[in-house]
């Protein structure tokens, strides 16, 4: 059965339309709609007798709500917080105080949390203060969400409302994941530490190095803030790339003239995020295990570092390592056609599809028709799924066969084809 999840900003009109569509499907005898009816409203044995109120109840329960009215309250509460309408929030909460403790989006796995945390995500300070006065207890989670979203004023407000509590349970992991420089700086200003008695906070590093966000300059700055607060990063070429430190890469190249021909294992890419390195072919897009610094730069959208490498002798057609089953050998061009950055381009058209990295490689002579075989599997956060194999594909073939098109750049595909690329 469909498992429905309210979006971060739900739309009541859309839910009304969904209920009417569900009712029509039930009356038409649609198998999925009938199965939903039986699962969520087994007492109604005659589908032809279903009314709109019945379809609304089925829909509400499929969203995890106990009733249609509970679903409506959730949407109205979310909408009021988005509009910064404190009066409506107060009315809804006082009419049903249980809402103060329940997730606004109903589902237990919603990381936007109860009303105070939900408001903290949006920097709605007046609403945060009011909900605290009404008895909200999710201060730590709300503070974490404010930091993650870079709402520094809200973070400080929650810290003061809580009576300046111990910082032991505050973490830098949230703003590390979203690459929020402001949130990281605010937590450091409060006294949160990146170093623990046993070394750097591994959870924070896993969130920073393994994030699916793409904002190289922000990641560089956050890593330098960690250094300013006691972190001593490993002196490796990949860490220099993570930090955006071309000066350190220059030093590594001087010591190792073969640097640009070397390939790196996934554990080299995520040295302080061991959980990210456990499965070599699991990736956010094109796998990064066994690849060169140019592939790694493409994986993290480090265009300026790639320009420097190409200016200093990097072969634009440098290949990934080939394993004992013949998988590998792909170039960085594959890594630009299918990438995490493309997800953010395609997801609600969030960023322009400039395909800068693809254009850079092609302008520097990358072969658009190199063939390679790849094995790839999605991270759990992107839905997981089976390990898939792609044999003897070109960059265009890789993009066409990749199952999740949100990770495929249409502009990259167009550019590759314009440079003579074939399937």
What positions do the PLM features span?
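Ankyrin-repeat boundary/"N-cap" motif
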Residues: 73-79, 102-118, 137-148, 165-177, ...
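Long, contiguous interaction/recruitment modules in multidomain scaffold/adaptor proteins
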Residues: 52-61, 65-75, 198-218, 222-227
């Amino acid at each position: 059965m469909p498992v429905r999840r309210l979006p971060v900003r739900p739309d009541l009109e859309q839910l009304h339309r969904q209920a009417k569509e569900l009712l029509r499907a039930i009356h038409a005898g649609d198998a999925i709609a009938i199965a939903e009816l039986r699962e969520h409203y087994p007492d109604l044995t005659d589908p032809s007798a279903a009314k709109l109120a019945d379809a609304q109840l089925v829909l509400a329960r499929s969203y995890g709500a106990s009733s249609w009215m509970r679903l409506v309250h959730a949407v109205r509460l979310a909408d009021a917080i988005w509009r910064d309408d404190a009066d409506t929030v107060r009315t809804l909460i006082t009419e049903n105080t249980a809402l103060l403790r329940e997730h606004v989006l109903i589902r237990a796995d919603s990381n936007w949390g109860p009303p105070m945390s939900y408001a903290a995500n949006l920097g709605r300070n007046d609403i945060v203060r009011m909900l605290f006065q009404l008895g909200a207890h999710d201060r730590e989670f709300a503070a974490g969400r404010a930091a993650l979203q870079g709402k520094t004023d809200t973070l400080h407000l929650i810290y003061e409302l809580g009576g300046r509590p111990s910082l032991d349970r505050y973490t830098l992991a949230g703003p590390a994941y979203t690459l929020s420089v402001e949130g990281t700086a605010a937590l450091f200003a409060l006294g949160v530490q990146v170093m623990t008695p046993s070394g750097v906070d591994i959870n924070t590093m896993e969130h920073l190095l393994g994030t699916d966000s793409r904002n190289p300059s922000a990641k560089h700055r956050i890593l330098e803030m960690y250094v300013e607060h006691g972190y001593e990063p490993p002196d490796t070429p990949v860490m220099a790339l993570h930090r955006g430190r071309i000066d350190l890469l220059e030093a590594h190249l001087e010591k190792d003239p073969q640097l640009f021909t070397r390939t790196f294992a996934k554990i080299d890419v995520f040295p302080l995020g061991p959980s990210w390195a456990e499965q070599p072919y699991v990736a956010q897009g094109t796998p990064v295990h066994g690849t060169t610094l140019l592939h790694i730069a493409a994986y993290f959208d480090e265009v300026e570092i790639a320009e420097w490498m190409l200016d200093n002798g990097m072969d634009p057609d440098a290949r990934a390592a080939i394993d004992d089953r013949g998988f590998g050998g792909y170039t960085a061009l594959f890594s630009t056609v299918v990438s995490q950055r493309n997800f953010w381009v395609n997801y609600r058209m969030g960023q322009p599809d400039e395909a800068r990295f693809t254009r850079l490689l092609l302008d520097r002579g990358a072969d658009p028709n190199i063939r390679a075989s790849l094995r790839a599997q999605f991270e759990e956060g992107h839905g997981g799924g089976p390990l898939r194999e792609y044999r003897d594909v070109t960059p265009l073939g890789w993009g066409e066969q990749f199952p999740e098109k949100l990770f495929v750049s249409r502009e990259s595909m167009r550019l590759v084809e314009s440079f003579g690329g074939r399937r």
